[in-house]
Regions:
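C-terminal beta-strand-loop-alpha-helix "lid" module of Rossmann-like NAD(P)-dependent dehydrogenases
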Residues: 1-202
Length: 203
């Protein structure tokens, strides 16, 4: 979790100190479609763990027809398919033993859809692990990257990119997105275990 937060703040701060950059990763695409990576579990008996994530998608401001779902976790696939959501990728096997390479492979597919203009925004729905008795469903925007206004105050500090801004962002942002996704996977596994222990204690 500290690494997850540090990565998010570092990239936001870096971009805020980079002056005016025009890049698709920052401005978003023209498409109204939104890609959402949805992390749930493959098994039940975990209290409201899975249903709380599904509610982030079905009970929020999203328009069903505008969503492309990249699902990690069979329970999310079942629930969202039943409600008529478009599941473009089912990567539920990742949840059995998440690795960074698994995260990178799925992120590459989502980023490819973004760079091709098939989706204009990318979101991540997962369960934030606070402790074994407290887990919080979260929805965050991955792309376009949002610059932290607080970081723009230090106008005397500017970032210089080598060889140029575009190539640097093409290298940095995919790693940034993949790192956030992998961090979310790790938190989700811990949260699932905590939720299941609570459910068993309550049974």
């Amino acid at each position: 979790n500290p690494y997850f937060n540090y990565m998010y703040k570092t990239v936001s701060s870096m971009l805020a100190k980079s002056g005016t950059i025009d890049h698709p990763y920052l401005r978003g695409g023209q498409s109204n479609k939104k890609a959402v990576v949805v992390i749930t579990s493959n098994r039940g008996l975990a209290g409201g763990y899975n249903s709380n994530i599904v509610k982030l998608i079905t009970g929020g401001d999203f328009v069903k027809e505008d969503l492309d779902i990249y699902a990690v976790g069979g329970k999310g696939v079942e629930a969202l398919s039943r409600r008529g959501y478009n599941i473009v990728e089912n990567a539920s096997e990742i949840m059995e033993a998440p690795t960074y390479s698994d995260a990178a492979a799925l992120c590459n597919k989502v980023l490819d859809a973004f760079t091709k203009g098939e989706v204009g925004e990318i979101y991540l729905a997962y369960t934030h692990f606070k402790n074994t008795v407290s887990q919080e469903p979260k929805l965050i925007k991955l792309l376009p990257v949002e610059i932290d206004p607080a970081e723009t105050d230090d106008s005397n500090v500017l970032m210089n990119y080598e060889p140029n801004e575009e190539e640097a962002l093409n290298m940095i942002i995919p790693k940034y997105v993949t790192s956030l996704f992998y961090g979310a996977l790790v938190e989700a596994v811990a949260s699932e275990n905590g939720a299941r222990m609570q459910a068993m204690d309550s049974a």
